[in-house]
């Protein structure tokens, strides 16, 4: 047998036990990809004021061979501690996180790509003898199917005042705020296999 599959009695290509290919589905679907991460930290101060600032960027190009996927994340942190008076301490913490993910819907949280790949038989052909992709690789869903785009903006803020009116007597006041703005977009395309 010199072809990856043969037609059945209806003229359709065989793709399970009657096919003849030898496919490593993980290698067909995934590739090595680059990721980059950059960090910046600044801190300083004196006995009455201390500050810390950090920023981080992570970018990943994605590891799908078919159907583009990308991920970006930006994180910033800010901390400030001050003791302007003997009877008062001030602490401020702020954090901002931005995440963006763009990938085929078939690979999103409810997608079945990883589930399906681990159940594909090696003899299931990747392409038919005419050079067209077979339906088993889910390539049509990855390349022409639906997309999932999401971005998230998380902001955290914490403030604290510590009063020392008398020796060994502390009064603490805290405030915190967290906001999460999430944008999800999914476009659903019909895919024929």
Spell out what each predicted region is.
Residues 25-27:
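Surface-exposed cleft-lining segments at the edges of enzyme active sites
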Residues 35, 46-47, 83-87, 164-166:
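Outer-membrane beta-barrel channels and translocator barrels
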Residues 44-48, 57:
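A generic beta-sheet turn/junction motif
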Residues 155-161, 165, 169:
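Short, Φ-rich (hydrophobic/aromatic) sequence segments
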């Amino acid at each position: 047998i010199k072809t990856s599959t043969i037609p059945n009695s209806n003229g359709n290509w065989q793709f399970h036990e009657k096919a003849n290919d030898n496919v490593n589905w993980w290698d067909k679907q995934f590739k090595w990809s680059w990721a980059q991460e950059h960090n910046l930290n600044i801190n300083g101060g004196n006995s009455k004021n201390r500050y810390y600032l950090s920023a981080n960027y992570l970018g990943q190009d994605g590891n799908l061979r078919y159907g583009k996927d990308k991920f970006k994340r930006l994180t910033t942190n800010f901390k400030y501690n001050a003791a302007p008076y003997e009877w008062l301490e001030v602490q401020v913490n702020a954090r901002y996180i931005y995440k963006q993910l763009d990938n085929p819907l078939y690979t999103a949280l409810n997608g079945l790509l990883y589930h399906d790949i681990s159940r594909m038989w090696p003899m299931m052909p990747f392409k038919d003898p005419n050079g067209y992709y077979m339906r088993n690789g889910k390539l049509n869903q990855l390349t022409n199917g639906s997309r999932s785009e999401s971005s998230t903006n998380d902001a955290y803020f914490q403030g604290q005042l510590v009063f020392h009116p008398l020796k060994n007597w502390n009064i603490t006041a805290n405030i915190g705020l967290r906001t999460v703005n999430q944008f999800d977009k999914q476009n659903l395309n019909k895919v024929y296999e």
